[in-house]
Amino acid sequence: MKNSFIGTTGRIPLWIVGFVVGSLALGLLGILFYGSYTGLGSSL
């Protein structure tokens, strides 16, 4: 199963890595901004 995800470079495609990292970063920022806006993270 794992071999099917390995390409010619032996690494995960860069666009997949960028998409995952970007999604996690935006999600984390969204949670932080939402928390600070609603007052849940205002104590931080």
UniProtKB/Swiss-Prot annotation:
Coiled-coil residues are: none
Q: Where in the cell is it found?
A: Plastid, Chloroplast thylakoid membrane
Keywords attached to this entry: Chloroplast, Membrane, Photosynthesis, Photosystem II, Plastid, Reaction center, Thylakoid, Transmembrane, Transmembrane helix
Q: Which GO terms describe its cellular component?
A: chloroplast thylakoid membrane; photosystem II reaction center
Gene3D superfamilies (UniProt xref): 6.10.250.2070
Q: Name one Pfam family in it.
A: PsbJ
Q: How does it sit in the membrane?
A: Single-pass membrane protein
HAMAP family per UniProt:
PSII_PsbJ (MF_01305)
User: Which family, according to the similarity comment?
Assistant: Belongs to the PsbJ family.
Quaternary structure and partners: PSII is composed of 1 copy each of membrane proteins PsbA, PsbB, PsbC, PsbD, PsbE, PsbF, PsbH, PsbI, PsbJ, PsbK, PsbL, PsbM, PsbT, PsbY, PsbZ, Psb30/Ycf12, at least 3 peripheral proteins of the oxygen-evolving complex and a large number of cofactors. It forms dimeric complexes.
What's this protein's function?
One of the components of the core complex of photosystem II (PSII). PSII is a light-driven water:plastoquinone oxidoreductase that uses light energy to abstract electrons from H(2)O, generating O(2) and a proton gradient subsequently used for ATP formation. It consists of a core antenna complex that captures photons, and an electron transfer chain that converts photonic excitation into a charge separation.
List the PANTHER family hit by this protein, alphabetically. Answer: PHOTOSYSTEM II REACTION CENTER PROTEIN J
Identification of the protein by name:
Photosystem II reaction center protein J
Whichever gene encodes this chain, its name is: psbJ
